Structure formats: C-alpha cells, structure tokens
Design a protein with these regions (language model features):
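A short C-terminal helix-loop "cap" of Rossmann-like NAD(P)-dependent dehydrogenase/epimerase domains
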Residues: 9-13, 155-169
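Structural signature of beta-strand start/N-cap positions in the alpha/beta core
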Residues: 40, 95, 138-140
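Short-chain dehydrogenase/reductase
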Residues: 1-66, 154
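Conserved Rossmann-like nucleotide-binding pocket used by diverse enzymes
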Residues: 17, 44, 72, 138, ...
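A conserved structural motif in NAD(P)-dependent oxidoreductases
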Residues: 169-180
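Catalytic loop of short-chain dehydrogenase/reductase
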Residues: 49-88, 95-134, 146-148, 167
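Short, flexible catalytic-loop segment of classical short-chain dehydrogenase/reductase
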Residues: 139, 143-154
Length: 180
C-alpha cells in the first residue's frame, strides 16, 4: 500500500484494489470490482515476481521445494490466473503485458529460481498469446534489462549485474523504471 497509494494519487486515481495472486477468491474479487467500476478492460500490465531472497544466494541446486512452488506460483502462474479473468472483460480485444529478464534465456549469477520462473513465464506468454489471439487479445513480454525494483533488491550482488549491464548494453546504461 505504501508504494501503490502514492502512485495512484500521482495518476489522479482513487481506485486502489488489493489482489493476492496466490488466492483465487482475491483475484475474483479484484476483477469483480473492475467489472463493476468500468464494465470492460483494455489492458493489464503483469509486473509481479517473488522468491525467498535467501534462496537467491548460493546455487540453484539448493532451492527448496516450497520456494520453487511459491516462486512459480507468484512469478509465472499468476499471469495465467489473471488472463483467465481478464479475457471476460476484454470483449473488444485487449493487451496483456508482462515483464521478463535475460535470466530466462541464460544463467545469471544469483538469479537461480527466478531464471526458471522467467523461462516458464515466457513460454506461458507464447501459449496464452496463441489461445487469446483468437479473441483479439495480444499477450507479450518485454525484457528491458535489469532495473532497480523492490523485487531486484532481493538478488545478491544485484549492483554487479547493473554495472555489468551498463558496460555491455548498447546504451551503455541501465534501463529506468520510467522507460519501461
């Protein structure tokens, strides 16, 4: 709430609804509120990821079953759960956008289970795009590079990843939240 409410105020919006993506009832309640308020939906930006930050240290091989399941649920399956409900409000088509990272394609130090989750997310995007394209709903993922976010703060040596990106990206700098 401490981050979302100021953002809503900055956008002159009084609508701030809770949505726990690990709970189907919470997701249903969220979309019911959207339906009552607007009746339809044009787009969704899925910018959700989570993993136990202690398991982003060391090696992927040490990932616990509990964290694997929770990370996949929050970071990947949540997109599918949101698409299931959003499509009902996108009667004239729409756009669903999620965020990925190069760690989905290649090994990145300390990214561990998040790399697996982002790989699964990217594959989910392809299948969701196939299913929902018939309903004129586009589903895409963007991978803008490492960005300083709350989720990124849990990754060990994230500063190193940012610096590496600054030296190796075509822009010779990291992408900002505002650019995305």
């Amino acid at each position: 709430k401490k981050r979302v409410i100021p953002l809503a105020e900055k956008c002159n919006s009084s609508m701030v609804y809770e949505c726990d993506v690990t709970n189907d009832e919470s997701i249903d309640n969220f979309f019911n509120k959207i339906s009552k308020e607007w009746g339809s939906l044009d787009f969704i930006v899925h910018s959700i990821a989570f993993s136990d930050k202690n398991e982003l240290k060391g090696g992927y091989v040490d990932t616990s079953r509990e964290n694997f399941i929770n990370t996949m649920n929050v970071s990947c399956y949540s997109l599918t759960a949101l698409c299931q409900r959003a499509r009902l409000l996108m009667k004239n088509g729409g756009q669903i956008l999620t965020l990925s990272y190069v760690g989905a394609e290649r090994v990145m130090p300390h990214y561990n289970i998040m790399g697996i989750a982002k790989s699964a997310l990217e594959t989910s995007v392809k299948y969701l795009a196939e299913d929902l394209g018939k309903e004129n709903i586009r589903v895409n993922a963007i991978s803008a590079g490492p960005i300083k976010t709350l989720a990124a703060s849990g990754i060990s040596d994230f500063r190193y990843i940012l610096k590496w990106n600054e030296y190796n990206s075509p822009l010779r700098r990291s992408t900002s939240i505002e650019e995305v």
